[in-house]
């Protein structure tokens, strides 16, 4: 067993201010080394070529179901209760909550926006035809947080958004596929889940599960404090039959 003080002394000997900076440097170096391989694998056209022969030789329903189940298991195996509780506390304790997603991840962001709006005040999405995420985060502070959802091929805009939030001292809750994700170096709390697929697109079923599970932890944390808000929403939506 190595003591915490020994680890800190070692990282400072290497020229880092502490273990966290050392950890970020290791993640960044690993990511840069792996990206050339990851990029080749995640290009949709190349993934399609690799997957066609496998799909031809197997039952598509059974194969895809098995793949989704493996991804769901990855959420449970990689993240424990403490990870979800910490992420929930960071979100609930922040003044403003910004949701950062792009492209295919936007479907997760839309659902997350809906659920968090019902649970907490001051929840904002950062995608808008007239504004980009940088415009939305230009006045973010250390009292705020972002919830970023990013998977291969990681969006450069998502990366810049997390960097911007980090520079402002804001908390960053990241849902991604692995701890070596380019955005992970800036994250306060990471939740990892696999999006592996046997075809050309990422599978987001397990990501949706992870997001819903996170919202369940937030709901439990908030308790009955959201009851009045939910009743108010239902009161007016009932008038137009929108549920």
Task: Briefly describe each language-model feature range.
Residues 1-82:
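HTH-adjacent hinge/linker in prokaryotic transcriptional regulators
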Residues 30, 36-39, 122, 165, ...:
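Juxtamembrane helix-loop transition sites at the ends of transmembrane segments
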Residues 89-209, 213-223:
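Glycine-rich phosphate-binding loops that contact phosphosugars or nucleotide phosphates
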Residues 82-89:
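A short, basic/flexible loop-to-alpha-helix module at the beginning of a structural domain
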Residues 224-243:
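A short, charged, Gly/Pro-tolerant segment at domain boundaries
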